[in-house]
């Protein structure tokens, strides 16, 4: 972050951490708009520098940028509740073809197995 630009931005957004998060969000938006040809690419400046300069100049609404950031972090999908019990029973019927051997809670066969640790060296579980 350029020191002069960051110091100018501190007048608008006193918290540096908040400034970094908001400037990053705005830089990502700028980068997206440049890639989709919605705005012209400014010469020699990268999106983070442009976003800091625009925040320092007051050309960007900080409140709107915060709200945009919050909306982008929210979960987009909703979990649908199970309306009737018959649907869950249908799911159980889909797994009836599996033999009982596959559906077990017995892990005693793991005692004799060989495992590989993260370094790639073999070792036996004892």
From Swiss-Prot:
Alphabetically sorted, this entry's keywords are: DNA-directed RNA polymerase, Nucleotidyltransferase, Transcription, Transferase
Q: Which InterPro entries match?
A: DNA-dir_RNA_pol_omega, Pol_omega/Rpo6/RPB6, RPB6/omega-like_sf
Organism, by scientific name, is Rickettsia felis (strain ATCC VR-1525 / URRWXCal2) (Rickettsia azadi)
Q: What is a biological process (GO) this protein takes part in?
A: DNA-templated transcription
Any one Gene Ontology cellular component term annotated for this protein = DNA-directed RNA polymerase complex
Quickly give the catalysed reaction.
Answer: RNA(n) + a ribonucleoside 5'-triphosphate = RNA(n+1) + diphosphate
* Listed SUPFAM superfamilies: RPB6/omega subunit-like (SSF63562)
Report what the protein is called: DNA-directed RNA polymerase subunit omega
SMART domains per record: RNA_pol_Rpb6 (SM01409)
| Top-rank taxon, per record | Bacteria
Taxonomic placement: Bacteria, Pseudomonadati, Pseudomonadota, Alphaproteobacteria, Rickettsiales
- Subunit-structure text: The RNAP catalytic core consists of 2 alpha, 1 beta, 1 beta' and 1 omega subunit. When a sigma factor is associated with the core the holoenzyme is formed, which can initiate transcription.
- Major enzyme class: transferase
State the family named in the UniProt similarity comment for this chain. Answer: Belongs to the RNA polymerase subunit omega family.
One Pfam match: RNA_pol_Rpb6
- Which Gene3D superfamilies does the record cross-reference, listed alphabetically? 3.90.940.10
GO terms assigned for molecular function = DNA binding; DNA-directed RNA polymerase activity
**Protein function:** Promotes RNA polymerase assembly. Latches the N- and C-terminal regions of the beta' subunit thereby facilitating its interaction with the beta and alpha subunits.
Q: What is its EC number?
A: 2.7.7.6
């Amino acid at each position: 972050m350029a020191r002069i630009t960051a110091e100018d931005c501190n007048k608008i957004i006193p918290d540096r951490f908040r400034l970094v998060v908001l400037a990053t969000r705005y830089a990502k938006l700028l980068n997206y708009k440049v890639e989709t040809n919605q705005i012209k690419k400014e010469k020699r400046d990268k999106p983070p520098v442009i976003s800091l300069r625009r925040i320092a100049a007051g050309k960007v609404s900080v409140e709107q940028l915060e709200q945009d950031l919050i909306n982008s972090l929210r979960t987009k999908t909703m979990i649908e509740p199970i309306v009737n019990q018959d649907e869950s029973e249908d799911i159980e019927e889909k797994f009836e073809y599996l033999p009982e051997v596959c559906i077990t809670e017995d892990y005693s066969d793991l005692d004799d197995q060989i495992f590989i640790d993260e370094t790639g060296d073999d070792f036996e579980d004892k």
